[in-house]
A protein has these predicted regions:
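Outer-membrane beta-barrel transmembrane strands
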Residues: 8-24, 33-34, 135-174
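Outer-membrane beta-barrel translocator/receptor signature
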Residues: 1, 8-52, 60-64, 153
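Surface-exposed loop/interface segments of Gram-negative outer-membrane beta-barrel transport/assembly proteins
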Residues: 1, 40-41, 50, 54-154, ...
Length: 174
C-alpha cells in the first residue's frame, strides 16, 4: 500500500510563555514561543522559535513616552514533494519499495524504479531512470532534500514628547 508508505499521523506542538511587569516602575513584556509540526507526508516537518520584547518607559513627568519593540523568528522547514500523493495513488502496488541488486543501489539508492536501457555510455551509472514511468514515491521523499531556513528580526522605536510649556503641542517620531 503506497499510501501507507508515504503518509503518517501528524503530530504538532505549540508552546508559548510570556511575562510582563515593571522594572523600576517602567513596564515591559517578554514572550517566547516554539512550534513543531510534522506533516501528514512522512518527510514534511516545520519548526519555529519566536521571541519578542517590549519596553515602554515614561520620562520627565510623563512628557516623554518611549515604546520600544523587538521581535524575532527562526524557522526550519522540510518540504515534501507534492507529486508523491498522485504517485502513491497510481504506482503499481505489486512492486516493492526497495529493489535487490547492486545496480539499483548504485543508480537509485536501493529503491525500486522503472528502468530503461542506459544509453549514456557511463559505466558508473548501470541503470537509467525511465522518465515516461512514475517515480517510486518513497524514493522521491527520501532522496529529495527540499529544505529552508528563515530568520527575521524586526524592531520599532516610538517616541512621543509633549512640551512642558504647551502640552497640546507634541512631537511624535516612529
Amino acid at each position: 500500500d503506497w499510501q501507507k508508505e508515504i503518509f503518517r499521523d501528524a503530530f504538532s506542538t505549540d508552546h508559548n510563555v510570556s511575562m510582563s511587569g515593571n522594572i523600576a516602575g517602567q513596564p515591559f513584556r517578554a514572550s517566547l514561543g516554539a512550534t513543531i509540526q510534522n506533516g501528514v507526508i512522512k518527510t514534511s516537518t516545520f519548526s519555529r522559535l519566536t521571541g519578542s520584547l517590549s519596553y515602554a518607559p515614561s520620562f520627565f513627568d510623563k512628557h516623554l513616552n518611549v515604546n520600544a519593540n523587538l521581535k524575532g523568528m527562526w524557522a526550519k522547514n522540510r518540504y515534501a514533494d507534492g507529486s508523491v500523493v498522485g504517485d502513491a495513488l497510481t504506482f503499481d502496488p505489486t512492486q516493492p519499495v526497495y529493489a535487490d541488486g547492486a545496480d539499483y543501489m548504485t543508480s537509485f539508492g536501493g529503491y525500486f524504479q522503472w528502468t530503461g536501457k542506459n544509453e549514456y555510455g557511463d559505466p558508473s551509472w548501470p541503470l537509467a531512470y525511465n522518465n515516461l514511468a512514475q517515480a517510486n514515491p518513497v524514493s522521491t521523499l527520501d532522496l529529495q532534500q527540499n529544505r529552508a531556513i528563515s530568520r527575521s528580526l524586526i524592531g520599532n522605536l516610538e517616541l512621543d514628547y509633549k512640551f512642558h510649556f504647551l502640552p497640546d503641542l507634541r512631537i511624535h517620531i516612529n
